[in-house]
Amino acid sequence: MSVFHLALNAHILIGTVVLVSFWTAALAAKGSTLHRRGGKTYVIAMAGLLAVTLVTAVGMVLDGDPRRAMFNVYVTLTSVVSVWMAWSSVAWRHDIRRYLGWPYKLLFGALAGYGLFVLSLAPRMPQPARVAMVTAFAVLGLSIAAAMAWRLWKRDDSPRWWLAEHLTAMAINFAATHASFSILAGSSVLEALKDPWMRTAVLVAWMISALGLRLWAGRRFLSPKAAARATTLGAARAGAAG
């Protein structure tokens, strides 16, 4: 079995852990022990998954497909950015300067530059379906970079800026986790998911779903009423702990 296929099988296996931990954190009460443990498991599993993805890229190069490997690295970068944002926005929620430090700026610059490069490659793809897929991924990365630029400009424009960042990152992770699992694991069962147009449709569907999820989460958790509830709950927990 080639390096590529070994890494692909590992990707599907770890991806299952990623999917389960994502929904464990998503469905748990926010801020609860289960929520935090699910989130921690998700970050650790994603770190392993992204490492495997880079091995997959090496396998692609060894199989004589460097263009696909380069694209694979770009997809990995978008996930690295979103996982970093999801973790660091909570870890440094009281320190916007640390959150927007050099790692954030480095990831922003890398994603913006790589996204523009990938977008420039789209018209050169040999098939219309691949043009559409590469364009969709480029737009995804550039949209994330635009959100990062907005945060660099606005900084801590509200007391719950960190939650806005966390929700944005988790919406991106939602799309990445489910699109990857649908395409990679699904294509091993359904032959239709190997078709480039079908894969593009799946990707775009999850991207649109992620946008809808982020808009809903913003209304659910960032409204003045939600902030008041969080303050009351925090005070109650502090009182119970005291």
At which residue positions do the language-model features occur?
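Alpha-helical membrane insertion/targeting regions
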Residues: 1-242
